[in-house]
Amino acid sequence: MSRTPEQIVRQFIDAFRESWPRDLDAALAPLADDAYYQIVVPSMEPIRGRAAIKAELEHMQKRVLDQKHDMKAVAASGNTVFTERCDWSFSKGRWVSIPLVAVFVLDDAGRIVEWREYLDPSHVAKQHGMTLDELRDSLAV
């Protein structure tokens, strides 16, 4: 691996920093084919496989017209990278803030194999004017 795990994760997040990526396949290239993404730990089951993750993000794009990320802090320990961010979603005519911590685990080849996001789903649901069940349903492909 010529780049550090932190550099790989920063580049991955940068693809989503200002808006939805124009080329989702290129943005998801750092993910291993069998990677998993857990949108809300522990409330939601992980989405397994790059193709399924892409389908979930495409589903989100239909509901969230725009999004961006503000990176607050990054720390790495070996192949594990921790990020503290505030994500923003533009939906129903307004921006909604989503404070979260994400944990990424990379394999020895530098591919992201685990992507877990820890956040308060009730905060997100409230800002979107939804119940927790409605939020969960809206995230399911």
Kindly label every feature range from the protein language model.
Residues 1-2, 46:
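Alpha-helix initiation/capping motif
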Residues 2-30:
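Short acidic-aromatic low-complexity motifs
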Residues 17, 43, 114:
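Short, flexible active-site loop motifs that bind/organize anionic cofactors or intermediates
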